[in-house]
């Protein structure tokens, strides 16, 4: 499989909010650090994407938590267009991922699904990509849903093939 690593697609989801900001900073000695931090209501979004060795694929932001119907819609609208025969879709053991409809759709493209063991997010390299995504989102400090979506779109373009290959 080492020679066929371009066939692997790691799928996962992560939460993003409009209150993401850096909680620490630096200032000159003797000066106080002043920065704005959100307070009050914020919007939560779910970001779903796949990681190949050459970049992020099928990114999708939704205004709801992940469930089976949303996962099936993600597979149909975002994932299927980027799948090739022989691809292996690797995902965590979330109950919403265990959809017969999604599995049939993936198999119809000649690909197949492989589930990670329970409670093992450290085996999914997309988690490292999500750490970078969230660090950039904190820097972007998006305070509206539209700004958050634009920031995510801009950040997805920052993932180089070399970087994704190293994950």
Question: Which residues does each PLM region occupy?
Answer:
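Short, well-ordered coil/turn elements that cap or connect secondary structure elements
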Residues: 3, 84, 108-110
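C-terminal anion-handling pockets and recognition modules
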Residues: 5-8, 126-167
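Extended, low-complexity cationic-aromatic segments
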Residues: 1-76
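RNase H-like two-metal-ion nuclease catalytic core shared by retroviral integrases
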Residues: 92-93, 100, 114-138, 146
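Short, aromatic/basic amphipathic alpha-helical patches
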Residues: 99-109
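Mobile genetic element proteins and their domesticated derivatives, centered on retroelements
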Residues: 10-12, 49, 75, 92, ...
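The start of beta-strands in P-loop NTPase/AAA+ ATPase cores
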Residues: 7, 87-88, 112
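Short, basic/hydrophobic alpha-helical segments
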Residues: 70-88
């Amino acid at each position: 499989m080492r020679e066929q690593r371009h066939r692997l697609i790691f799928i996962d989801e992560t939460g993003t909010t409009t209150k993401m900001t850096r909680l620490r900073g630096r200032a000159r000695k003797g000066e106080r650090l002043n920065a704005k931090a959100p307070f009050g209501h914020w919007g939560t979004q779910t970001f779903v994407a796949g990681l190949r060795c050459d970049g992020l694929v099928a990114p999708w932001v939704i205004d709801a938590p992940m469930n089976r119907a949303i996962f099936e819609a993600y597979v149909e609208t975002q994932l299927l267009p980027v799948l090739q025969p022989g691809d292996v879709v690797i995902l965590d053991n979330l109950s919403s991922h265990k959809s017969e409809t999604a599995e049939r759709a993936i198999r119809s493209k000649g690909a197949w699904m492989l589930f990670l063991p329970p409670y093992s997010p450290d085996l999914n390299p997309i988690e490292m990509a999500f750490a970078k995504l969230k660090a950039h989102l904190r820097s972007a400090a998006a305070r509206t849903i539209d700004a958050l979506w634009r920031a995510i779109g801009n950040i997805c373009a920052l993932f180089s093939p070399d970087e994704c290959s190293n994950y």
